[in-house]
Regions:
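Acidic (Asp/Glu)-rich catalytic clusters
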Residues: 9-15, 43-48, 62-82, 100-114, ...
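C-terminal helical cap(s) of enzyme catalytic domains, especially alpha/beta-barrels
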Residues: 283-302
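Acidic-and-aromatic substrate-binding clefts and catalytic sites of carbohydrate-active enzymes
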Residues: 35, 53-68, 88-99, 167-172, ...
Length: 302
């Protein structure tokens, strides 16, 4: 495994452990998502707002070769703290290819200095696939067994595993989260907005998962748009274009309560500002929205 890369804002590491997600700049692997901003600009703007830590972004955002990615990160004085991988976990026939996919991404993440792999269980080989019906007991057994295998993969690469309950995935609502917690020992990624969209209470999830939370996605949503997405009357991708994600503190997710609950549970790992957005043109400037979220969040984390 490659060396850990330690750089970035001393304030971010020592005080509030806050990273920024490239998703805040509209970065997405979906080809029809919207205008894409290159990594150089994202990294430089992250540093400009005082945050020297990011998450890895989707495939292709950073160079596939770890030495090239590390060179870019060093040049911009940024560290990567976590990265996400989407995998099909409930099909026994997909076990080999999916584990190989996860292992390859884990190797790359460790080589560029990340410490956490965020795993989302997708229904199909697409991060934005529509969610099918509930899993059968046999599919749940396959999923939980494979989660255990992914834990071993992460341990081999000295990474923490954080399974993310995510709207549109095979693990999203309260019943599925409880089944994950009871049926495995895996860590959890708490994504406030995705929990709200799926109809879960993030504070209740913090209390249920307390010592299992390994990573946190901070975000806020328009409650009416979130309800329409949950009910199926509005597509998730279209909802983002209509303003589903709002600057933190301006939506209905009650982020301050969630952070208070995390603090009460002695959570001490990384937070990531993860506000998905879609940019129509190169003239769009997401930095203003990011700064508004930071103005609200930073005092809560200090």
């Amino acid at each position: 495994m490659g060396e850990r890369v330690g750089f970035g804002s001393r304030r971010s590491r020592a005080v509030h452990r806050l990273a920024l997600s490239p998703a805040c700049w509209g970065v997405n692997e979906d080809g029809g998502w919207g205008h894409q901003i290159d990594a150089e600009r994202v990294l430089s703007e992250a540093v400009a707002v005082g945050e020297g830590a990011i998450t890895a972004g989707p495939p292709g955002f950073l160079p596939d070769r770890s030495d090239q990615a590390k060179s870019l990160l060093r040049r911009q004085h940024v560290q990567v703290v976590a990265g996400q991988v989407h995998a099909i976990l409930h099909h026994h026939a997909a076990r080999g290819p999916e584990l190989a996919h996860i292992d390859g991404h884990a190797h790359w993440l460790a080589a560029i200095g990340a410490d956490t792999l965020v795993l989302s269980a997708i229904p199909e080989r697409s991060p934005n696939a529509a969610r099918p019906g509930p899993l059968s007991n046999a599919e749940w057994a396959h999923l939980l067994h494979l989660v255990g295998s992914v834990e071993h993969v992460c341990a081999r690469h000295r990474l923490k595993l954080a399974v993310q309950p995510r709207f549109g995935s095979t693990i999203q609502g309260p019943e599925e989260i409880e089944r994950l917690l009871v049926g495995s020992e895996a860590g959890v990624c708490l994504d406030i907005a995705h929990l709200v969209i799926a109809g879960a209470d993030p504070v209740e999830v913090v209390e249920l998962a307390a010592g299992r939370i390994q990573h946190v996605h901070l975000n806020d949503v328009d409650p009416d748009i979130a309800r329409r997405v949950r009910e199926g009357s509005l597509d998730y991708k279209e909802a983002i274009a209509r303003g589903l994600y709002m600057p933190i503190g301006e939506g209905g997710a009650k982020v301050e309560r969630v952070i208070d609950a995390l603090r009460a549970s002695a959570y001490s790992n990384w937070y990531t500002l993860e506000q998905e957005t879609r940019l129509a043109t190169s003239d769009d400037r997401p930095l203003g929205r990011i700064s508004r979220s930071l103005e609200y969040v930073l005092p809560l984390l200090s």
